[in-house]
Amino acid sequence: MAAKYVFVVAACSALAQAGIVRRDASTPLQDLEKHAAEFQKTFSEQLNAFTNSKDTKEFNTALKEGSDSVLQQLNALASSLQKALNDANGKAKEALEQTRTNLERTAEELRRAHPDVERQAGALRDRLQTAVQATVQETQKLAKTVGANLEETNKKLAPQIKSAYDDFVKQAQEVQKKLHEAASKQ
């Protein structure tokens, strides 16, 4: 009997410790928020550094191609959010809808700035930077809203949001790399 009692007390203690550790651990959406803030800062700093070099045709071409790929990724992210809307409800659904609308607006602004890259390289660079920053901010805001509302919804939506965000970041990093290569050739 004493052995059972000791076992039960040990099991309860282990469960209590696990609960404490679990509460202290960050959620995937909190990790996403933190990463988004760091990525946004790095992307802005590097883009500004690249554009302080000479404006050459090669850099402008890389800027246009980067803008194209960010535009495609913005559309993919908006599409992923639309799919996630089907699994959401309440405040999470409202946040997803607002984020998707804002991303579509950002994509449209980037699309309008696109045609005359040679003449408007500076404006396109600014729009590209704004598009990336807006996307990161919208994702952060979405993560906060979803994370603060429903743990059950969070479990369903967190992987979808994180996956879409990770795809966006990979594409934005590729843009950074190409712009860096173009700026280095000058």
UniProtKB/Swiss-Prot annotation:
Gene Ontology, cellular component aspect: extracellular space
Gene3D superfamilies according to UniProt: Apolipoprotein
Protein name per the record: Apolipophorin-3
Pfam families: ApoLp-III
Entry keywords, A to Z: Antibiotic, Antimicrobial, Cleavage on pair of basic residues, Immunity, Innate immunity, Lipid transport, Secreted, Signal, Transport
Cross-referenced CDD domains: ApoLp-III_like
GO annotation (BP), single: defense response to Gram-positive bacterium
Record's signal peptide: 1-18
Quaternary structure note: Equilibrium between a soluble monomer and a bound lipoprotein form. Apolipophorin-3 associates with lipophorin during lipid loading until each particle contains 9 or 14 molecules of apolipophorin-3.
Family: Belongs to the insect apolipophorin-3 family.
Membrane-spanning intervals of the chain: none
GO molecular function: lipid binding
Propeptide: 19-23
Keyword Lyase listed: no
Subcellular location: Secreted
Family annotation (InterPro entries): ApoLp-III (IPR010009)
Tissue expression profile of the protein: Expressed in hemolymph. Also found in hemocytes and fat body.
Free-text function comment from the UniProt entry: Assists in the loading of diacylglycerol, generated from triacylglycerol stores in the fat body through the action of adipokinetic hormone, into lipophorin, the hemolymph lipoprotein. It increases the lipid carrying capacity of lipophorin by covering the expanding hydrophobic surface resulting from diacylglycerol uptake. It thus plays a critical role in the transport of lipids during flight in several species of insects. Has antibacterial activity against the Gram-positive bacteria L.monocytogenes (MIC=6.5 uM).
